[in-house]
Amino acid sequence: MGTQNTPPNFRPISRHDGLFKERVHDSYKSKEKPQEPSVCSQCGAVFHEGRWQWLQTPANAHSLQCLACHRIHDHYPAGFLTMKGEFFLAHRDEIMHLVHNHEQLERKEHPLQRIIAEEEKEGATLVTTTDIHLARGIGEALHHAYQGELDFHYNPEQNLLRVTWTH
């Protein structure tokens, strides 16, 4: 089996009747950027210079609901962080302190990254977040500080991340 010689004037014809990959639909993500400046009517975050920030509200700002407040209102998280294991149960208060500190640090720079809720389930704690990056960041911070097992399951169709930390 050798290589085939292609004639010099040969042009491949591509077919246009193939299957196209379906786009991910995230109803919480706007198709367009908000008008500038805009302010969230619930949390006060300001959309300015292409991103959400914590700023003084400009006098001419448009009022809207940011994506984080929308997810919180609908109880529809993008990130799920489950923490479990004997070490977790023995050091729960200290670990939850790290979780909240990490969220506060991220929220200062990224107003849309917030914890929605915390729930105790069968010896584990579930923390839900408004953003997949926050769930991942908290999981990585836990792993860095305490080791243990860290597992990620990303669902691109729903833009959803499940993080499990066990120790």
Stretches found by the model and what they are:
Residues 130-135:
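Helix N-cap motif at beta-to-alpha junctions
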Residues 75-113, 117-118:
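Surface-exposed, low-hydrophobicity interaction/linker segments
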Residues 95, 137-138:
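Hydrophobic side chains in well-ordered alpha-helices
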Residues 120-122, 158:
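Short Gly/Ser/Thr- and Asp/Glu-enriched loop/turn motifs at secondary-structure junctions
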Residues 154-167:
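C-terminal edge-of-domain segments
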Residues 1-74:
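N-terminal cysteine/histidine-rich coordination modules
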Residues 123-129:
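Short cationic amphipathic helices and targeting signals
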Residues 143-150:
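A common structural junction motif
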